Amino acid sequence: MRLEKCWFCSSTIYPGHGIQFVRNDAKIFRFCRSKCHKNFKMKRNPRKVKWTKAFRAAHGKDMTKDTTFEFEKKRNRPERYDRNVTENTLMAIKKIAKIRTAREAKHIENRLKPNKQKKLNDDMKELDQNIHMVQAPGAQKIKVDVSEKKSVQNEAMEE
């Protein structure tokens, strides 16, 4: 089964899905959905559209340079079937997937770390400025006795 990549968003296109556009110079553009095709016709740059993989790679949102990506290269050379090689390949795929998920999690954690510290500093600054609004959890509530002057005024209003 041949899986293609969308020209605009780089997502996988399965057989029987998507649309294909062939330019006069025989350049083939494949699109996964009409959203990508419309954006292409509007001459939008995929690196500037926030939901595309090109944007995420260009702005450091996703992991782009990693040794685990080299295993996914397309190879057009047919190889003779060997059960042992196939078994080893399938085991290697599982190990690589596990390594990649761990590295992606670490990448996300490192990417969010500076903002986490900045948010903590901003929260501490706001707390220092508005400390008078915070009540101590161990403080007892003060009960205020209402004087009878108000009740006399209420009776006068009722009449």
Swiss-Prot record:
Keywords: Nucleus, Ribosome biogenesis. InterPro entries: L24e/L24_sf, Ribosomal_eL24, Ribosomal_eL24-rel_N, Ribosomal_eL24_CS, TRASH_dom. GO terms for biological process: ribosome biogenesis. Signal peptide: none annotated. SUPFAM superfamilies: Glucocorticoid receptor-like (DNA-binding domain). One of its GO terms (cellular component) is cytosolic large ribosomal subunit. It is found in: Nucleus, Nucleolus. Coiled coil: none annotated. Associated with nucleolar and cytoplasmic pre-60S particles. At the end of biogenesis it dissociates from cytoplasmic pre-60S particles and is likely to be exchanged for its ribosomal homolog, RPL24. Interacts with REIL1 and REIL2. Belongs to the eukaryotic ribosomal protein eL24 family. This is Probable ribosome biogenesis protein RLP24. It comes from Arabidopsis thaliana. The gene is RPL24C.
